[in-house]
Amino acid sequence: MEQAPGDQGPQREPYNEWALEILEELKNEAVRHFPRPWLHGLGQHIYNTYGDTWEGVEAIIRILQQLLFIHFRIGCRHSRIGIVPQRRVRNGASRS
């Protein structure tokens, strides 16, 4: 007969504490890369859509993660992560 696994180390922190910590980190990073009025509008949209619920917290975490990922991938000016724009040769001299 199957048995539940025994104690396997320290307890993980509760999901809601983890989610709030992640949200705080994402907010701190987002204000360094996006205009505050724009982020405020996003927060208002999430609040109007989800109210003050955990579903809203999850939604804003997901959206901020996606926005920051795309922002870094396109190439943030004050980050070394991202696509480095290549210079284009006008006359095509470097083509093989």
UniProtKB/Swiss-Prot annotation:
Phosphorylated on several residues by host. These phosphorylations regulate VPR activity for the nuclear import of the HIV-1 pre-integration complex. Keywords: Activator, AIDS, Apoptosis, Cell cycle, Host G2/M cell cycle arrest by virus, Host nucleus, Host-virus interaction, Ion channel, Ion transport, Modulation of host cell cycle by virus, Phosphoprotein, Transcription, Transcription regulation, Transport, Viral penetration into host nucleus, Virion, Virus entry into host cell. GO terms for biological process: DNA-templated transcription; monoatomic ion transmembrane transport; protein homooligomerization; regulation of DNA-templated transcription; symbiont entry into host cell; symbiont-mediated activation of host apoptosis; symbiont-mediated arrest of host cell cycle during G2/M transition; viral penetration into host nucleus. Its main location: virion. Residues 1-42 are annotated as: Homooligomerization. The modification Phosphoserine is found at residues 79, 94, 96. GO terms for cellular component: host cell; host cell nucleus; host extracellular space; virion component. InterPro entries: RetroV_VpR/X (IPR000012). It is found in: Virion; Host nucleus; Host extracellular space. HIV-1 lineages are divided in three main groups, M (for Major), O (for Outlier), and N (for New, or Non-M, Non-O). The vast majority of strains found worldwide belong to the group M. Group O seems to be endemic to and largely confined to Cameroon and neighboring countries in West Central Africa, where these viruses represent a small minority of HIV-1 strains. The group N is represented by a limited number of isolates from Cameroonian persons. The group M is further subdivided in 9 clades or subtypes (A to D, F to H, J and K). HAMAP family: HIV_VPR. Belongs to the HIV-1 VPR protein family. During virus replication, may deplete host UNG protein, and incude G2-M cell cycle arrest. Acts by targeting specific host proteins for degradation by the 26S proteasome, through association with the cellular CUL4A-DDB1 E3 ligase complex by direct interaction with host VPRPB/DCAF-1. Cell cycle arrest reportedly occurs within hours of infection and is not blocked by antiviral agents, suggesting that it is initiated by the VPR carried into the virion. Additionally, VPR induces apoptosis in a cell cycle dependent manner suggesting that these two effects are mechanistically linked. Homooligomer, may form homodimer. Interacts with p6-gag region of the Pr55 Gag precursor protein through a (Leu-X-X)4 motif near the C-terminus of the P6gag protein. Interacts with host UNG. May interact with host RAD23A/HHR23A. Interacts with host VPRBP/DCAF1, leading to hijack the CUL4A-RBX1-DDB1-DCAF1/VPRBP complex, mediating ubiquitination of host proteins such as TERT and ZGPAT and arrest of the cell cycle in G2 phase. This is Protein Vpr. It comes from Human immunodeficiency virus type 1 group M subtype F1 (isolate VI850) (HIV-1).
